[in-house]
Structure formats: structure tokens, C-alpha cells
UniProtKB/Swiss-Prot annotation:
Known catalytic reactions: S-sulfanyl-L-cysteinyl-[protein] + uridine(34) in tRNA + AH2 + ATP = 2-thiouridine(34) in tRNA + L-cysteinyl-[protein] + A + AMP + diphosphate + H(+)
Binding site for ATP: 13-20, 39, 128
Recorded GO CC terms: cytoplasm
Active-site residues, record numbering mapped to chain: 104 (nucleophile), 200 (cysteine persulfide intermediate)
Identification of the protein by name: tRNA-specific 2-thiouridylase MnmA
PANTHER family noted in UniProt: MITOCHONDRIAL TRNA-SPECIFIC 2-THIOURIDYLASE 1, TRNA 5-METHYLAMINOMETHYL-2-THIOURIDYLATE -METHYLTRANSFERASE
UniProt record, GO biological process: tRNA wobble position uridine thiolation
Positions of region (Interaction with tRNA): 150-152, 308-309
Subcellular location per the Swiss-Prot or TrEMBL entry: Cytoplasm
Native source species: Bacillus anthracis
One Pfam family of this chain: tRNA_Me_trans
Region Interaction with target base in tRNA, annotated ranges: 99-101
């Protein structure tokens, strides 16, 4: 697209946080025709009965007025419920630990929002994510953000060529302290606002309380693989593989961890020791594969992978089983690989794509107890 910046309309998703505020400021300073959109994805009130979305939208209004750009609020609650929240509940019901942020980016921020932006005459959408897009060798590549500590390509792993061709990440070359400083210098209302944490629709609330509103808890037995009962669990959906806190097992010796789930018998398996071999897998079957590139993949190739956000890169060999499934062979056993989570593939700074962890093996044996 050879338009000049002032002829190029960029619709930016604004959350009311400092990152998207500075991203909007940068686009405006670069001369683009910028429109701010606040996405209302969840009908939400906090413990005090305050609608947090209203507070966030008020921050968006204030920042947009400061920058001098128009703004709108768009309601995506139905799409979010259908595409993200239903998936979230289904995964927990199946005893897995989902990653709703990946699905939200795929289905809402870079699909429903992108379609809405194009209807507004947008040439591009932008967000405050820490990632980069580059056009090289005839296609779009997604690269890690320069700030290693904040890089968000893990959550963006399902984006396609079509989506990336319409996307700008203004913060990709910056580090978080620089962004805070820019917000402060510009006097933005969100300059000192703390970063949001946790799953977007739960916010700061207690996860267990939230989930119990939608899924009936089924308490059961907590035991070792040899059958020694160590207590009761509150419901398998509340525990993730490798979890230490909340088990309530006293006594001396090494701490206890959740090492597996038996859905049929509603048993939570536990064992002692952070480095317990029951927590380590060296082979993974992953499904719902999405590649950033449209180029045909080799049947087998080496790269690195992250099995959770902020994990170090692990050397792996990826084998293509079919267009929806890959087998991942790890050079070294990896702790607490969790079904339902995303595995994301990298070649240096380039994010190649990702998939959903489905089955975990150790030395050729499926870890059935992972549920």
C-alpha cells in the first residue's frame, strides 16, 4: 500500500491501558488518520459493583481527547461468548487448561474487530501488543517484540497472512520503561495506570469463585499414583499440572504437586518434589495447528518452542502428522507440559505459528493421568 500516512486510516483497539494509549499516540504523531475503538467483550462488574469496563472506557475517552482522535465503543460480547468463553468452559469441562487469550486474539481482536475496522474504512488495525510484523521474501512474518520480558507473540501465534497484512504493532521496537516514560511526557491519563493481570473476563477476582458460577464443582479424592489418599480436591478443573499451591497437604519433606488427573474416576494425582519425573514429558501431540506462513512445511524440521508464556525456548523437532496435527519431540524433557495450553514455534525471532497441546508422552509412554 503506497498511501501517505495522512491518507492511511488506522483503527486501533484501545483497552484503557498505557500500552494501547501510547500506541495510539505514536500513530497520531506519525501522521496517520487514527480512530480509537474500545472493545466491550464482557459484561463485567467487580466486587464493589463497579463496572470495570466503564472505568476503562472513561480512560480511553480521556486519552483520545488528549491525543486528538475520534473514539467509539463497540460491543463484541456475543462473539466473545460464542467463540472464546464457550471454548474456555468446554476445555475446563474436559479437564484441560485453556488459553483464552490466544482464542481472543484469533477470533475477536484480529477477526471481529478487524472486520469492523474495515467497515469503518480502515487500511490497518493496530493494537498495543509487543510484537513486530515484517514483510520479507514475499510474505508477512511475525517477529518477537524487542522487549523480551513483554513479547506477546505467544498469544498471537494463530494469526494468518491475511490478518498480519492488515496489522500494525506500534510498540514492537520499544521496551516497557520507554512506553511508561512516553506516556508520562505526553501527560496521558493512563501513564501511571497499573497493567492488568489475569484472564480478561475474570480480572482480579478469585478464579475458583468465578468458575463455579458456570461449571458445577465435583469434589473428589486426591491421591498418589500408588493409591495413597492424601486428601480431597475441590474439583479437577481448579488444578493444573505442576501446581503446588492450594493442595493443602501438610507434613514434612518435599512439597507436593499436582501431577495428573483421572477424569473418569475424578481423581487428582499428587506427588512430591519439584523435579518429580512424573511432571516431565519429552514428546507432545498438538492439534489445531496454525502456521503464519502459507508456504508448505517440510514433513520434519527443527526449531524452538514455548509450551507456556514466558518459558525459555526449548529445542524441538516438529513432525507434521496432518494439516491439523503435529508431533513434537523435545531435545530435553520439559516440566509440566499442560494439555489445553498453546505450544508456539520459533525460528530465532520469527514466530512460525502454534498449536494446542493434546497429549503428552515420556519415553514413548502416554501420560494418561494428565487427563
Amino acid at each position: 500500500m503506497n498511501k501517505l500516512p495522512h491518507e492511511t486510516r488506522v483503527v486501533i483497539g484501545m483497552s484503557g491501558g498505557v500500552d494501547s494509549s501510547v500506541a495510539a499516540l505514536l500513530l497520531k504523531e506519525q501522521g496517520y488518520d487514527v480512530i480509537g475503538i474500545f472493545m466491550k467483550n464482557w459484561d463485567d462488574t467487580d466486587e464493589n459493583g463497579v463496572c470495570t469496563a466503564t472505568e476503562d472506557y472513561n480512560d480511553v475517552i480521556e486519552v483520545c481527547n488528549q491525543i486528538g482522535i475520534p473514539y467509539y465503543a463497540v460491543n463484541f460480547e456475543k462473539q466473545y461468548w460464542d467463540k472464546v468463553f464457550t471454548y474456555f468452559l468446554d476445555e475446563y469441562r474436559a479437564g484441560r487448561t485453556p488459553n483464552p487469550d490466544v482464542m481472543c486474539n484469533k477470533e475477536i481482536k484480529f477477526k471481529a474487530f478487524l472486520e469492523h475496522a474495515i467497515a469503518l474504512g480502515a487500511d490497518y488495525v493496530a493494537t498495543g501488543h509487543y510484537a513486530r510484523v515484517a514483510y520479507m521474501d514475499g510474505e508477512y512474518k511475525m517477529l518477537r517484540g524487542v522487549d523480551d520480558n513483554k513479547d506477546q507473540t505467544y498469544f498471537l501465534n494463530q494469526l494468518s497472512q491475511e490478518q498480519l497484512s492488515k496489522t500494525m504493532f506500534p510498540l514492537g521496537e520499544l521496551k516497557k520503561p520507554q512506553i511508561r516514560e512516553m506516556a508520562k511526557e505526553a501527560g496521558l491519563a493512563t501513564a501511571a495506570k497499573k497493567d492488568s493481570t489475569g484472564i480478561c473476563f475474570i480480572g482480579e477476582r478469585n478464579f475458583k469463585d468465578f468458575l463455579s458460577n458456570y461449571l458445577p464443582a465435583q469434589p473428589g479424592v486426591m491421591q498418589t499414583l500408588s493409591g495413597e489418599v492424601k486428601g480431597k480436591h475441590d474439583g479437577l478443573m481448579y488444578y493444573t499440572i505442576g501446581q503446588r499451591h492450594g493442595l493443602g497437604i501438610g507434613g514434612n519433606g518435599d512439597p507436593w504437586f499436582a501431577v495428573g488427573k483421572n477424569l473418569k474416576e475424578n481423581i487428582l494425582y499428587v506427588d512430591q518434589g519439584f523435579h518429580n519425573e512424573l511432571l516431565y514429558g519429552d514428546e507432545v501431540i498438538a492439534t489445531n495447528v496454525g502456521w503464519v506462513s502459507n508456504e508448505a512445511k517440510e514433513k520434519e524440521f527443527k526449531c524452538t518452542a514455548k509450551f507456556r508464556y514466558r518459558q525459555e525456548d526449548n529445542k524441538v523437532t516438529v513432525q507434521i502428522v496432518d494439516e491439523n496435527t503435529v508431533r513434537i519431540l523435545c531435545d530435553e524433557p520439559i516440566r509440566a507440559i499442560t494439555p489445553g495450553q498453546a505450544v508456539v514455534f520459533y525460528d530465532g525471532d520469527e514466530c512460525l505459528g502454534g498449536a494446542t497441546i493434546d497429549e503428552v508422552y515420556r519415553s514413548g509412554k502416554k501420560l494418561d493421568c494428565l487427563g
